[in-house]
Regions:
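Divalent cation-coordinating acidic motifs and surrounding scaffolds
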Residues: 2-247
Length: 247
């Protein structure tokens, strides 16, 4: 932001409000969220919810490589807030019984995260849809969210089980389970930002957004993940820019 052309004497002009710089604007946005959600703690929990089936290897690598950069950027933007980061890696045990979900609960020990997530590998996935319901179950039942700003970054290249989420899916009973988990996220005022890789997950993301919005909350965003972007730092930029738009 351009500096003011002349200095303002605060005592002489007590009602003058100076323009906020970018950092102050970001803090003001988060303060509004805290006020709207009747919370007072200056804490920010960021959870990565990632499809960890076989086709997602390069995207999991980006998450592994760039967590510390994301942390640094957000700490600079929101210096007054205490951050925690966590991961849920979901697969498809519904259709591929050897698949398991994995999670790393929210922690502020960012320097320890690379060691933990380097063990995560992309594998499994039987049919096209994946077990979103299993992933969101962990989000709601196992992650230890704090009473502050809560954001999920959901990264996927395939939709969810359930005929309302993926046309022709044979596991129709999974849809209502996921419906309830999405509604619970809305009730808990967890902001959800979805990065869709290709067009396959679009129907699932769109239904989830509709359910979320119907709960009176509009903090559910969908945006494309450019598969052609190979630049180091692209994932960091995408995450940080998305967060500054929703907070």
């Amino acid at each position: 932001m351009d500096s003011e052309k002349k200095e303002i004497n605060d005592e002489a002009c007590p009602n003058t409000i100076k323009p906020e710089n970018k950092k102050d604007q970001n803090i003001s946005k988060i303060n509004k969220i805290l006020s709207d959600n009747t919370v007072s703690e200056k804490v920010f929990d960021l959870l990565f919810l990632i499809d960890a089936t076989g086709s997602m290897s390069s995207y999991i690598k980006a998450a592994k490589d760039e967590t510390q950069n994301i942390s640094k950027e957000l700490r600079n933007l929101y210096p007054e807030y205490h951050f925690q980061y966590g991961y849920v890696f979901y697969r498809d045990p519904i259709d591929s019984h050897d698949d398991i979900h994995e999670m790393i609960d929210l922690t502020d020990q960012v320097n320890n995260l690379p060691e933990k997530i380097k063990k995560i590998e992309a594998y499994g996935g039987g049919d096209l849809p994946e077990d979103w319901a299993g992933g969101y179950k962990l989000v709601n039942e196992k992650i230890t969210w704090r009473n502050g700003v809560k954001v999920i970054i959901h990264l996927a290249d395939a939709g969810a089980h359930g005929t309302d989420y993926t046309s022709g899916d044979k596991y129709s009973s999974e849809g209502p389970k996921l419906d309830n988990y999405i509604r619970e996220c809305a009730n808990r005022k967890i902001t959800i930002v979805c990065f869709q890789i290709g067009s396959e997950p679009h129907k699932s993301f769109s239904r989830a957004k509709m359910l979320y919005n119907n709960m009176g909350n509009n903090n559910f965003k969908i945006q494309d993940f450019d598969q052609n972007k190979k630049d180091p730092g692209y994932f960091t930029d995408l995450v940080v820019n998305a967060i500054t738009k929703v907070t």
